[in-house]
Amino acid sequence: MPLKELIDRDWQELESEGVLFSSLEKLVAWGRSNSLWPATFGLACCAIEMMSSTNARNDMSRFGSEVFRASPRQADVMIVAGRLSKKMAPVMRRVYDQMPDPKWVISMGACASSGGMFNNYAVVQNVDSVVPVDIFVPGCPPRPEALIYAVMQLQKKVRGEAFDQLGQQLPMVDAWTRELR
C-alpha cells in the first residue's frame, strides 16, 4: 500500500474519533486575535471616546482588549487617538519600537488619520508616516462602537480572515514577524 493512502486512512480514522487537526500557526493567530492588549496613547478628544469604549455599555472586554497597558512592553496594539504633534512624533515612534513583535496600530479619528479638519503646521498630517497603521477609524471623534468595530477587523486580520472590497482575501500577518506572506 502506498504511503499516501496509509496516511490518509490513518487521518480519516483519527478524524472519525474526534481528533482535530490544525496548524500551530493558525492556533497561535486565533489566541493572539482574542487577546489584543492595547497601549494607551491618547492625545486629544478621541482618547475620551477610547476610554468610554471600555465602560459597561460598550464592554470592549468581550474581545479580549479590556486591559489597557501603560507599558509598551506589555502591549501588542497601539491605538493612536487624536492629533499627533510634530514634537510628539519621535516619542510615539520610540513607544512603537519598544512594543514586542508582532504589533499592530489603530489610527483613531480624523486628526490621527489625516491631520484633522484644519491644516496646522504643528500637526503630523498622517500617523502612517511615523508608524505603519493597520486599521484607520474615521470620525471626529469616532464613537466607541467604531473603535470596537476596528478591533474586530484587526482580529480578522490577525487570524487571516480579512477581505478587501473586491472579495480578495488579504494576506495573513505572520505570527512571528511583521512581514506578509
Curated annotation (Swiss-Prot):
Assembly and oligomerization: NDH-1 is composed of 15 different subunits. Subunits NuoB, C, D, E, F, and G constitute the peripheral sector of the complex.
Species of the source: Deinococcus radiodurans (strain ATCC 13939 / DSM 20539 / JCM 16871 / CCUG 27074 / LMG 4051 / NBRC 15346 / NCIMB 9279 / VKM B-1422 / R1)
PROSITE patterns registered for this protein in UniProt: COMPLEX1_20K (PS01150)
TM spans (from-to): none
Cofactor note: Binds 1 [4Fe-4S] cluster.
Localisation per UniProt entry: Cell membrane
Protein name as catalogued: NADH-quinone oxidoreductase subunit B
Reactions the enzyme catalyzes: a quinone + NADH + 5 H(+)(in) = a quinol + NAD(+) + 4 H(+)(out)
One Gene Ontology term of the molecular function aspect: iron ion binding
Taxonomy, superkingdom: Bacteria
Membrane topology, as annotated: Peripheral membrane protein
Example of a GO biological process term: aerobic respiration
Protein function: NDH-1 shuttles electrons from NADH, via FMN and iron-sulfur (Fe-S) centers, to quinones in the respiratory chain. The immediate electron acceptor for the enzyme in this species is believed to be a menaquinone. Couples the redox reaction to proton translocation (for every two electrons transferred, four hydrogen ions are translocated across the cytoplasmic membrane), and thus conserves the redox energy in a proton gradient.
Keyword check for Metal-binding: yes
Assigned protein family: Belongs to the complex I 20 kDa subunit family.
Keywords: 4Fe-4S, Cell membrane, Iron, Iron-sulfur, Membrane, Metal-binding, NAD, Quinone, Translocase, Transport
Listed GO CC annotations: plasma membrane; respiratory chain complex I
